Amino acid sequence: MTQMWWRDACQPLDTAAMDQARARQQQLTKPTGSLGQLEGLAIRLAGLQGRERPTVEQVAITIFAGDHGVVEEGISAYPQAVTGQMLRNFVSGGAAISVLARQLEASLEVVDLGTVDPSLDLPGVRHLRLGAGTGNFARQAAMTDAQLAAALQAGRDSALRALERGAQLFIGGEMGIGNTTAAAALACTLMGCPARELSGPGTGLDSAGVRHKAEVIERALVLHGLRADEPLRALGHVGGFEIAALVGAYLACAQHGLAVLVDGFICSVAALVAVRLNPQCQPWLLFAHQGAEPGHKALLAALHAEPLLALGLRLGEGSGAALAVPLIRLACALHGQMATFAEAAVADRPA
């Protein structure tokens, strides 16, 4: 690939705004540190937005969808037709993320990168059709170089559209039957873990199904000879269209100064790929929750991430990130609207 835009510099955090926010936190009518993670969250958002009192009113959600050839190996509890059917559900308003987006008054964009139904043509969906799903990575590379570049660019384009709409926070979601297998294969490569440690039930596999899934991943890793220091090659060989688009979106957000709220296991794997491709993007990634997939805890630890929630979620779609938005908004409201000791005429703790 000649156009490696993902290596471009990311925006720095505004340390002066963070210092101002930190000083404000120490003046608010509460014991310092008593609001726990919410205090650090407000301070970090101040650095990301370049203002002492950040707000998160404008939220952009993009769902990236794509099918996976590795489903041929019997690694999913659901048929591939569900991917296309869920695209219809997203835009008709019946999916979980559709409901959450309405409640949050967030924009919702749906991008079809390539499903097994090439005739799919849904109003309200951006159909890019990079292929009828990825190749079966148990037997061949998941993507060609051209497909990988196009998927990364699709994510970048979505992030730029969010910026044009005035977004203050970007949430990427995903849909693709078989994508926990692709995500686990990527994570195993980048973290150097055996597949059995990172393979989970996904949409509902039983214990035998999970063992088979791990075996498929292990065989694929041997086939492709992937290395932890080659994240782009790993993404192309065992990733997915939607995972690559998430990577592109996260990197573009960091390069253009838009905070990202990362969803669950699959999105966290995309975040790990993004960080390995361009470590400067890491400060721009906030992590919404620790999900039910057994590998998510280790993945978050590898990212040095402190998730906001732990609700046992395993839906995907960006739903866990959307659920964390009210908490972020409240953290900003507390930071911006609480009185200082001086304003409230309340005695502060003696120095």
Curated annotation (Swiss-Prot):
* UniProt-recorded Gene Ontology molecular function terms: nicotinate-nucleotide-dimethylbenzimidazole phosphoribosyltransferase activity
Q: Which Pfam families match?
A: DBI_PRT (PF02277)
Pathway as given in its UniProt record? Nucleoside biosynthesis; alpha-ribazole biosynthesis; alpha-ribazole from 5,6-dimethylbenzimidazole: step 1/2
State the active site.
317
Tell me which domain of life the UniProt entry assigns to the organism this sequence originates from: Bacteria
> Which EC number(s) are documented for this chain?
2.4.2.21
What the record says about family reads: Belongs to the CobT family.
Its recorded name reads: Nicotinate-nucleotide--dimethylbenzimidazole phosphoribosyltransferase
Q: What is the lineage of its organism?
A: Bacteria, Pseudomonadati, Pseudomonadota, Gammaproteobacteria, Pseudomonadales
Gene name tied to this protein:
cobT
